[in-house]
UniProtKB/Swiss-Prot annotation:
GO terms for molecular function: 4 iron, 4 sulfur cluster binding; metal ion binding; rRNA (adenine(2503)-C2-)-methyltransferase activity; rRNA binding; tRNA (adenine(37)-C2)-methyltransferase activity; tRNA binding. Gene3D superfamilies: 1.10.150.530, Aldolase class I. This is Dual-specificity RNA methyltransferase RlmN. GO terms for cellular component: cytoplasm. Binds 1 [4Fe-4S] cluster. The cluster is coordinated with 3 cysteines and an exchangeable S-adenosyl-L-methionine. CDD domains: Radical_SAM. SUPFAM superfamilies: Radical SAM enzymes. Disulfide bonds join 113-350.
């Protein structure tokens, strides 16, 4: 006797669908494509996820949508407010996992730091996220859902609402370019006029240097770029950012320059992020070496004092060493800022995000990249093999 499953098919989550994908969804329902614009505005501008409240959509279509689709953001399970106004959200993403999202106010500017993965496989030595191991990529709905939940928290939805989130940075948990498609779709929703409408100069992707993905990035988006550098030479960067052993500094900076060369003149400059660690990379010779390294590249430099966390023996840079390092770069002609530590009393400062990572089946201390894939200039999939032989893939869907 054969028992047939009576389980209903899974509903399509519209939260993370781009305009093109949402139009294709309505095509599949035999509906007009303009419905995609209506639904995007309801979800991302009005904060409405209940189809019954989407009043400019006919009742029969609302009923149909309720049967086959949903609009669901991941759930905020905890929230902490810092004495300096920083707000950290703990967001559940399933499987007992959670990621952290941080809002940082600064005058009339409010920056949201968004996560792209549950944990991270890159294991940068100064970052708490890497110590948690790696579980999986976030879906586009889980990435843009962080923005949606933060906007809801600040009552940003609706006509005439004050915009509190003025900038978004992909600098939370995970390496964005190892979750290429979902990150690109999410960033494009952030900048879409029918969604959050952020200027392209107000959305920034930060990468430790997955060069094959960075080489493809300009085909899919033109957001701003930040390079998580942290060292002026390969020997030191190999220790701090292990992916440098596969994509050394020269290869990374060449790829980054190709990307910014494709941007409009007004945005043709990248940010170099440099975490200063006491007695590790904070000496005057490091500053001089960094100035020489970047001399032919349009950059601004953001110095980040190391923020201590459990499991790390590194120490915060001294104020004297920080000021000396900054002055050397300024004297060399670089715009050089210091990132003010915000939210450290709630473990929300840069490098402190850890979330909750369960089932670390893809945890890695180091990984290997298939050289044959790197040599294939037109490869669509570049497999990344972790030491435990679990696989992660960078996939480009054109």
């Amino acid at each position: 006797m054969t028992v047939e499953s009576t389980a209903a098919p899974a509903k399509v989550n519209l939260m993370g669908l781009s305009q093109a994908k949402l139009e294709a969804f309505f095509d599949s329902l035999g509906e007009k494509r303009f419905r995609a614009t209506q639904v995007l505005k309801w979800i991302h501008q009005m904060g409405v996820t209940d189809f019954e409240q989407m009043t400019n959509i006919s009742k029969p279509l609302r009923d149909k949508l309720s049967q086959v689709a949903e609009a669901v953001a991941p759930e905020v399970v905890n929230q902490w407010d810092s004495s300096d106004g920083t707000r950290k959200f703990l967001i559940r993403v399933g499987g007992g996992n959670a990621v952290e999202t941080v809002y940082i106010p600064d005058g009339d500017r409010g920056t949201l730091c968004v996560s792209s993965q549950v944990g991270c496989s890159l294991d940068c030595s100064f970052c708490a996220t890497g110590k948690q191991g790696f579980n999986r990529d976030l879906t586009a709905a889980e990435i843009i859902g962080q923005v949606w939940q933060a906007a809801k928290s600040f009552n940003q939805f609706g006509v005439g609402a004050q915009r509190k989130i003025t900038n978004v940075v992909m600098m939370g948990m995970g390496e964005p370019l190892l979750n290429f498609d979902n990150v690109v779709d999410s960033m494009n929703l952030m900048m879409h006029d029918n969604c959050y409408g952020l200027s392209k100069r107000r959305v920034t992707l930060s990468t430790s240097g997955v060069v094959p993905a960075l080489d493809k990035l300009g085909e899919y988006t033109d957001a701003c770029l930040a390079i998580s550098l942290h060292a002026p030479n390969n020997a030191l960067r190999n220790e701090l950012v292990p992916i440098n052993k596969k994509y050394p500094i020269e290869m990374l900076l060449a790829s980054a320059k190709r990307y910014i060369d494709g941007l409009p003149d007004v945005r043709r400059k990248m940010t170099i992020e440099y975490t200063l660690i006491d007695q590790v990379n904070d000496r005057p010779e490091h500053a001089h070496e960094l100035a020489e390294l970047l001399k032919d590249i349009p950059v601004k430099i953001n110095l980040i004092p190391f923020n201590p966390f459990n499991l790390s023996n590194y120490k915060r840079v001294s104020n004297n060493a920080l000021r000396r390092f900054q002055q050397i770069l300024i004297d060399a002609g670089y715009t050089t800022t210091v990132r003010t530590t915000r939210g450290d009393d709630i473990d929300a400062a840069c490098g402190q995000l850890a979330g909750q990572v369960n089932d670390r089946t893809k945890r890695s201390q180091r990984y290997k990249i298939d050289k044959n894939a790197l040599d294939a200039s037109n490869a669509d999939i570049i497999p990344v093999k972790l030491v435990d032989e679990a696989d992660v893939s960078i996939t480009f869907n054109g």
